[in-house]
């Protein structure tokens, strides 16, 4: 947690993925400034050992990393749930239940007034497809999936996707 504000940098699901959670801001540029500053410090530290953060939807070294969850009941439960796909033998599920530890995405939470709620929702709905393609997807070289949106396949053809309300744009 930052000493100057409520920003937090934490591990998301596994120790391979960092989450940046920012305090409320009046302008998105304020968040961008803080993100740029944090990223610069982190990249400098990681660079000392020839590592770096990359903005990819799938960790490029997913098959070499320790994909165990962060020791937290929430993440341990998530990974156990995803692993149920091995025993349920449901049709059309992929064989990578550990994917929760090496894929990442983006989330945006905005505070909006009642007056502009509908227009804000409409704008975000219009950019959702582009946002998903640009920020949350990647190729997955270990599979026969000939796509640049492998993150969607991980999600939709897993235990997450067996519930229709968890997959696609609803």
Label each residue range with its predicted role.
Residues 1-170:
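Phosphate/nucleotide-binding catalytic core
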């Amino acid at each position: 947690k930052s000493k100057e504000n409520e920003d937090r940098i934490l591990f998301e699901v596994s120790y391979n993925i960092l989450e940046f959670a920012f305090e409320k801001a009046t302008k998105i540029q304020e968040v961008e400034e803080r993100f740029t500053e944090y990223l610069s410090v982190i990249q400098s530290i990681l660079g000392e050992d020839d590592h770096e953060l990359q903005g990819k939807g799938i960790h490029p070294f997913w098959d070499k990393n320790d994909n165990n969850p962060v020791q937290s009941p929430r993440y341990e439960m998530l990974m156990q749930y995803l692993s149920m796909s091995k025993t349920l033998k449901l049709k059309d599920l992929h064989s990578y239940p550990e994917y929760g530890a090496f894929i990442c995405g983006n989330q945006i939470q905005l505070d909006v007034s009642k007056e502009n709620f509908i227009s804000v929702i409409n704008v975000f709905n219009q950019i959702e497809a582009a946002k998903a393609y640009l920020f949350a997807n990647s190729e997955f070289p270990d599979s026969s999936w000939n796509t640049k949106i492998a993150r969607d396949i991980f999600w939709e053809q897993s235990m997450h996707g067996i519930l229709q309300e968890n997959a696609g744009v609803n």
